[in-house]
Amino acid sequence: MPAIFFGHGNPMNAISTNGYTEAWAEIGRTIPRPKAILCVSAHWYVPGVAVTAMERPKTIHDFGGFPRELFEVLYPAPGSPELAERVNELLGGDVILDMNHWGLDHGTWSVLVHVFPDADIPVVQLSINEIEPAEFHYDLAKRLAPLRDEGILVIGSGNIVHNLHTYAWGKHGAEPFDWAMRFDAKARELILNDDHGPLIEYESLGRDALLSAPTPDHYLPLLYVLALKRQYEEVTFPVEGFDGGSISMLSVRVG
């Protein structure tokens, strides 16, 4: 099973038809059907490692200021307590099994509503531990590698470049900032060269990196996918582009 990082961008993509969402739908049509999905979303960024372990995760509308139509979207995919337990096992038994607090946030459902619109594949979310450094997340993700051979699609959902302070709201065709394009290109180069060290220590890559990822939450899901890459395995970029000048919509497929 491949592992895929999705640049999810603006929540409005959930109810939009554009080049990004059409590419997401094409991914869903062409990859093997997974038994279940494990998603690491930028929007479950908390002080601890947890997994959703309920039978029926709720759809979380974790945003404000958007049209009512977006708040009416539901993604009623089942959960998978079995997958939650398997993740807990792989991670050493110290994971919080969340039975009722979280659910599926828009980092997950705004993409999956296009990739698997029937919402008939079980979905589990894994939180991002906000108190740990990037290396922790990369190392933790490596322990999830057996899932790929068990028919589980591992997804990271965030954005390699994500700076809302400079985002041109309502100007989806805005030219990307030079620093955003440079960091996006640098990340691609490092990914293609299997040079994950600088991507883990991304803050040391200079001003472009600090502007592109001013907070870690949207960047870290990328590391969960890169950590699952095997030697000599193909990496592709099925979705490319920028939104609002400072959000990279780049997606990364491993395998």
Residue ranges and their predicted role:
Residues 4-5, 62-67, 116-124, 200:
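Short, basic/glycine-rich phosphate-binding loops at helix/coil junctions
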Residues 83-138, 143:
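Internal, conserved structured core segments that host functional sites
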Residues 23-30, 136-150:
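Long, well-ordered alpha-helical scaffolding segments within enzyme catalytic domains
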Residues 3, 37, 123-125, 154:
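Conserved beta-strand scaffold positions in the cores of enzyme catalytic domains, especially
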